[in-house]
Amino acid sequence: MPRVVPDQRSKFENEEFFRKLSRECEIKYTGFRDRPHEERQTRFQNACRDGRSEIAFVATGTNLSLQFFPASWQGEQRQTPSREYVDLEREAGKVYLKAPMILNGVCVIWKGWIDLHRLDGMGCLEFDEERAQQEDALAQQAFEEARRRTREFEDRDRSHREEMEARRQQDPSPGSNLGGGDDLKLR
């Protein structure tokens, strides 16, 4: 099953969901809402250093669980995210974040910043052209492999049917659909 839709760019540019989230808008950290604000600040900073966080787009209520690593790290042993993905040094009191993902079958990058004290900020989705091309190539390979396996199955099925038909042609006994009695034995 492919992880992406056939025309990712078109879906990103034309679907209302993506159009709304591709404009920079207000975001909030949504983790540990039941905890005191100071504890949430600490937990948010620790989560960022670990390469993950939960945010919500305020205007739409869309919640995302983000991972701040290159897309190629999916499923591999993770380390501390690089400054490209979690930048605590660019501006005092803020963290700049970047999270590549596949969202609704489209390769995107979430980019934004969050104020370390208020736990809110601004963010948006961008179309990830490079990853989209990679995923399209993987989907095409999977499609070609499935097509090859289907052809092999159909070829085996056809030769089996031809073999069975040849056996029927050789067996002159009326009402027999199979060959001789030996064909009925389990092998």
From Swiss-Prot:
Keywords: Nucleus, Phosphoprotein. GO terms for cellular component: core-binding factor complex; nucleoplasm; nucleus; protein-containing complex. Expressed in all tissues tested. Highest level in thymus, but also abundantly expressed in muscle, lung and brain. Changing residue 5 to A: Interferes with heterodimerization. One of its GO terms (molecular function) is DNA binding. The modification Phosphoserine is found at residues 10, 159. It comes from the Eukaryota. Pfam families: CBF_beta. The keyword Nucleotide-binding does not apply. One of its GO terms (biological process) is lymphocyte differentiation. Residues 139-187 are annotated as: Disordered. Its main location: nucleus. Residues 144-170 have a biased composition (Basic and acidic residues). InterPro entries: CBF_beta, CBF_bsu_sf. Forms the heterodimeric complex core-binding factor (CBF) with RUNX family proteins (RUNX1, RUNX2, and RUNX3). RUNX members modulate the transcription of their target genes through recognizing the core consensus binding sequence 5'-TGTGGT-3', or very rarely, 5'-TGCGGT-3', within their regulatory regions via their runt domain, while CBFB is a non-DNA-binding regulatory subunit that allosterically enhances the sequence-specific DNA-binding capacity of RUNX. Heterodimer with RUNX1, RUNX2 and RUNX3. Interacts with COPRS. Found in a complex with PRMT5 and RUNX1. Belongs to the CBF-beta family. This is Core-binding factor subunit beta. It comes from Mus musculus.
